């Protein structure tokens, strides 16, 4: 991944900061109630490509990371909630940071597929360091997902609130 940002040294003097990073894909295994229904969600709604599978689990390319869905018919999908920017955020949750210019199209695609948002797409920390678009929804097994996008990707790990 290449992060590019314009930095100001002093009045009318700017430089371009280029940060080269190589992300190591993460692995996440989550419980699902029904394997067939969950395959449909991750493949046909989120567009994830299926890899290896058995009768009890399936691997997915989740935006370059490895997501494994495992059958747990007793999974209740309950979550705790914490307040962030005045919104009740489901905990735990997982997701992906997508490009700023793709966020609205992705949100529209989810709406077209009748995905109910727990937190509707909106801009969080508007005008502040770490300004981002975010949205939360559940998969068909009650696992909370967050998709977000940063206006300035170099602020992904900002310590300023």
Predicted regions and their residues:
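A generic structural signal for short beta-strands and their flanking turns/coil linkers
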Residues: 24, 56, 65, 90-92, ...
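Short secondary-structure boundary/capping segments
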Residues: 20, 50, 58-59, 83-86, ...
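A short, polar/proline- and glycine-enriched secondary-structure boundary/capping micro-motif
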Residues: 78-82, 156-159
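N-terminal beta-strand motif that seeds the catalytic metal site of vicinal oxygen chelate
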Residues: 13-36, 93-94, 149-161
């Amino acid at each position: 991944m290449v992060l590019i940002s314009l930095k100001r040294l002093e009045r009318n003097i700017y430089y371009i900061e280029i940060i080269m990073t190589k992300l190591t894909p993460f692995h996440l295994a989550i419980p699902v109630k029904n394997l067939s229904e969950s395959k449909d969600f991750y493949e046909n709604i989120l567009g994830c490509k299926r890899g290896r599978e058995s009768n009890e689990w399936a691997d997915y390319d989740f935006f370059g990371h490895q997501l494994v869905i495992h059958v747990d018919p007793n999974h209740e999908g309950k979550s705790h909630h914490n307040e962030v920017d005045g919104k009740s955020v489901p905990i735990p949750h997982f997701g992906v940071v997508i490009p700023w210019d793709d966020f609205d199209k992705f949100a529209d695609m989810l709406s077209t597929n009748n995905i109910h948002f727990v937190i509707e797409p909106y801009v969080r920390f508007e005008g502040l360091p770490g300004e981002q678009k975010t949205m939360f929804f559940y998969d068909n097994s009650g696992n909370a997902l967050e998709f977000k996008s940063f206006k300035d990707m170099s602020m992904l790990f900002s310590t300023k609130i």
